[in-house]
C-alpha cells in the first residue's frame, strides 16, 4: 500500500492530527507579528530640534522656546531637521510672552541663518512612547536607516530560506523547528535589549533566519502528517492564522507603547513554543526516506495508539513500511537542480514569468504594508484594516480560480493592485479616506495574488522539480521583500517615484502572467518532457492522467511554499 493508505490505517484525521496541527498553527500568529513589527517599533514620531543650550537658563514656555528656536515649514509646522543658528528673540513681544507679528520681524526671521540639529531632537510621544527612531535619532540625515533595518530583517528571511531548506532535508523537520523556535526567542529578546542600532539589526537578522526555519518546518510537519483531502482546509486555516496574527500585533502594540517591551512581547512566546515543540513527532515519511525506518515505525505506532487504533498499531511492521515507501523512493531517484528550470524553452518561460509574478507581488505587498505613516490615518486603525482585508480577498480569489481559472485570476488581481496604487498618486494628500480605500483595495489584491501564486506555481512546475521550482520563486518573493523598503528612499528625490514603481511592477507581471498556460481542469505535469510537450501543442502523456480539483490544490504545495 502507498504511504497515504498507511497513514489512513493509523488514523489520518484523528486526535493526534487535530492537536498536532493546532499546536503548529499557534506560532504562526506570532510569526506575522515579527514580519510587521517594524510598523510599530520604527514609527517616525513628529519631531523638531532641541533648543540651544544657552536657553536652559531662560524662563520660557515650550511654545516660546519653539518659536524662537525652530522655523516653520511650508505647512506652518516646526521644521524637523533645522533650527535657527541663534535664538530669534525679536519674535517674542515686548512683554516676552508673545510675538509682535510685524513685517520687519517676519522678514528678519526669513533671512536668519539656519543650522542642523546639533543638540538633538524632541519627539512627540503621543502615539508611541518610544521607538527605535527616537531611541537612536534615526531622523533627518539618518532617516534611511529605518528602511535599512527592515531590509536586513528580510535578508535574514532570505538566507534562512536557503539555509534551513537543505538542513531540514538532511537533519529532519523537528530538530530544525526546535532550533528555529529557540533562535527566534533568543534573537527577539536580544533585539529588545539592544544598546545600539547595529546590534538591533544583527538580532533582527537572526529573527529573519528563524522565521524562515519556522515557516518551512511548520508546514512540512503539517503536510506530512495529514491526508491530501484536507490539505486545502488546513492550508487555508494556517493562512488565516497569519491574518489573525496581524490583528494580534495591533492589540499588543496599542497597549504596549514602548518598542523594547513590544519586541519582547512578541518574542517571549517562542520560549513556550520551543518547549511545546519537544512533543512533536518527526515526520515518518522523512524518516523512512532517510533510511531510519525503525524510528518511523515507532512514530506511526505512537500515532495509532494516540488515535485509539491499538490493533492497527500492532499490525504495523518494517516490511509494511518498506512496501508503502517504494513509490516515494523511486520518485527521489535522479538528480535535479535549479538549472533544470531554465534548460528547456517551455520550462524557462514558465519559470521567468512566475519569478516576475512572485517578485512583484511580494515587492508591492511589503511596499504598502510597511509604509502606513503616509496615509495620515491612525496607525492602529490602518493596520487593522490592512489585516482584515486579507480575509475576504482570499475567499474571493479561491472562488475566482474555480470559476474563471488560475491565469485570469492571477492577471486580474495583479493588474487591479497596480492600478489602485497608481491611482493613489493622483489623489490629493488631504483626501485621506480615498487614499486609504485605494491602498486597502490594492493590499487585498496583493494578498489574493499570494494565494493564487501558491496554487498556480505548484500546478505549473512538474513533480520531479516542483520543490526546486517553489524554492526558486519563494526566493524571488523574498528578494522583492528586501528591495521594497529601500525603494521608499527615492521619495526624497522624486516624491511620486515609489508609488510609480510599486504600481508599475504588478501591472507588468500581470501582463507576463498572460503567457502562462491555464491549469484549471488540467492534470499536474510529472516531468519536464510533459511541460515541453504541453508547450509545443503536441499530445502529451498527461492527457491520460487524472485531472485535479481545487480541493487537491495544496497536495504538493504546503511543504514547498514554506
UniProtKB/Swiss-Prot annotation:
Broad class of where this protein is predominantly found: membrane
GO cellular component, one term: basal plasma membrane
Family in the record: Belongs to the major facilitator (TC 2.A.1) superfamily. Organic cation transporter (TC 2.A.1.19) family.
Keyword Membrane (UniProt): yes
Compartments, record wording: Cell membrane; Basolateral cell membrane; Basal cell membrane
Protein modification: Glycosylated. Glycosylation is necessary for proper targeting of the transporter to the plasma membrane.
Cytoplasmic side: 1-15, 169-174, 227-235, 282-351, 400-408, 466-468, 517-562
Gene expressing this chain: SLC22A6
InterPro entries to which the protein is assigned, alphabetical: MFS_dom (IPR020846), MFS_sugar_transport-like (IPR005828), MFS_trans_sf (IPR036259)
Name used for this protein in its record: Solute carrier family 22 member 6
Keyword set, alphabetical order: Cell membrane, Membrane, Transmembrane, Transmembrane helix
Source species: Pseudopleuronectes americanus (Winter flounder)
Domain remark text: Multiple cysteine residues are necessary for proper targeting to the plasma membrane.
Transmembrane segments: 16-36, 148-168, 175-195, 206-226, 236-256, 261-281, 352-372, 379-399, 409-429, 445-465, 469-489, 496-516
Pfam families attached to this UniProt entry: Sugar_tr
Amino acid at each position: 500500500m502507498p504511504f497515504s493508505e498507511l497513514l489512513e490505517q493509523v488514523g489520518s484525521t484523528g486526535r493526534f492530527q487535530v492537536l498536532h496541527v493546532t499546536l503548529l498553527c499557534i506560532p504562526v500568529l506570532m510569526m506575522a507579528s515579527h514580519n510587521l513589527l517594524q510598523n510599530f517599533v520604527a514609527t517616525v514620531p513628529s519631531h523638531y530640534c532641541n533648543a540651544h543650550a544657552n536657553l536652559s537658563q531662560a524662563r520660557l514656555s515650550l511654545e516660546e522656546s519653539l518659536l524662537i528656536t525652530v522655523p516653520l515649514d511650508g505647512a506652518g509646522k516646526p521644521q524637523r531637521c533645522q533650527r535657527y543658528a541663534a535664538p530669534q528673540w525679536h519674535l517674542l513681544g515686548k512683554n516676552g510672552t508673545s510675538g509682535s507679528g510685524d513685517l520687519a520681524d517676519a522678514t528678519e526671521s526669513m533671512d536668519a541663518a539656519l543650522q542642523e540639529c546639533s543638540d538633538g531632537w524632541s519627539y512627540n510621544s503621543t502615539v508611541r512612547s518610544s521607538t527605535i527612531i527616537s531611541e537612536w535619532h534615526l531622523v533627518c540625515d539618518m532617516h534611511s536607516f529605518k528602511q535599512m533595518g527592515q531590509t536586513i530583517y528580510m535578508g535574514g528571511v532570505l538566507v534562512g530560506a536557503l539555509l534551513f531548506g537543505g538542513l531540514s532535508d538532511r537533519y529532519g523537520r523537528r530538530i530544525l523547528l526546535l532550533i528555529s523556535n529557540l533562535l527566534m526567542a533568543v534573537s527577539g529578546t536580544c533585539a529588545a535589549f539592544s544598546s545600539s542600532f547595529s546590534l538591533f539589526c544583527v538580532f533582527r537578522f537572526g529573527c529573519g533566519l528563524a522565521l524562515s526555519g519556522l515557516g518551512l518546518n511548520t508546514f512540512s510537519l503539517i503536510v506530512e502528517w495529514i491526508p491530501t483531502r484536507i490539505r486545502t482546509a488546513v492550508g487555508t486555516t494556517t493562512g488565516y492564522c497569519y491574518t489573525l496574527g496581524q490583528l494580534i500585533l495591533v492589540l499588543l502594540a496599542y497597549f504596549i507603547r514602548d518598542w523594547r517591551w513590544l519586541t519582547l512581547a512578541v518574542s517571549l512566546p517562542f520560549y513556550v513554543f520551543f518547549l511545546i515543540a519537544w512533543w512533536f513527532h518527526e515526520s515518518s515519511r522523512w524518516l523512512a526516506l532517510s533510511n531510519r525506518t525503525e524510528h518511523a515505525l515507532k512514530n506511526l505506532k505512537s500515532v495509532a495508539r494516540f488515535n485509539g487504533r491499538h490493533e492497527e498499531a500492532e499490525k504495523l511492521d518494517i516490511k509494511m513500511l518498506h512496501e508503502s515507501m517504494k513509490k516515494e523512493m523511486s520518485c527521489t531517484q535522479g538528480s535535479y537542480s535549479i538549472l533544470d528550470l531554465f534548460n528547456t524553452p517551455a520550462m524557462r518561460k514558465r519559470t521567468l514569468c512566475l519569478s516576475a509574478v512572485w517578485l512583484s507581488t511580494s515587492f508591492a505587498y511589503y511596499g504598502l504594508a510597511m509604509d502606513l505613516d503616509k496615509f495620515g490615518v491612525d496607525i492602529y486603525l490602518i493596520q487593522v484594516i490592512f489585516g482584515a482585508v486579507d480575509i475576504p480577498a482570499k475567499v474571493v480569489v479561491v472562488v475566482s480560480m474555480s470559476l474563471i481559472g488560475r491565469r485570469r485570476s492571477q492577471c486580474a488581481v495583479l493588474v487591479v493592485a497596480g492600478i489602485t496604487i497608481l491611482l493613489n498618486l493622483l489623489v490629493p494628500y488631504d483626501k485621506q479616506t480615498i487614499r486609504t480605500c485605494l491602498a486597502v483595495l490594492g493590499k487585498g489584491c496583493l494578498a489574493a495574488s499570494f494565494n493564487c501564486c501558491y496554487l498556480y506555481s505548484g500546478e505549473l512546475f512538474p513533480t520531479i522539480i516542483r520543490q526546486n521550482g517553489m524554492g526558486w520563486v519563494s526566493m524571488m518573493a523574498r528578494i522583492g521583500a528586501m528591495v521594497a523598503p529601500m525603494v521608499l528612499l527615492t521619495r526624497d528625490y522624486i516624491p511620486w517615484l515609489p508609488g510609480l514603481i510599486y504600481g508599475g511592477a504588478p501591472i507588468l507581471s500581470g501582463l507576463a502572467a498572460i503567457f502562462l498556460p491555464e491549469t484549471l481542469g488540467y492534470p499536474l505535469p510529472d516531468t519536464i518532457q510533459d511541460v515541453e510537450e504541453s508547450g509545443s501543442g503536441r499530445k502529451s502523456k498527461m492527457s491520460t492522467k487524472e485531472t485535479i480539483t481545487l480541493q487537491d490544490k495544496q497536495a504538493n504545495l504546503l511543504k514547498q511554499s514554506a
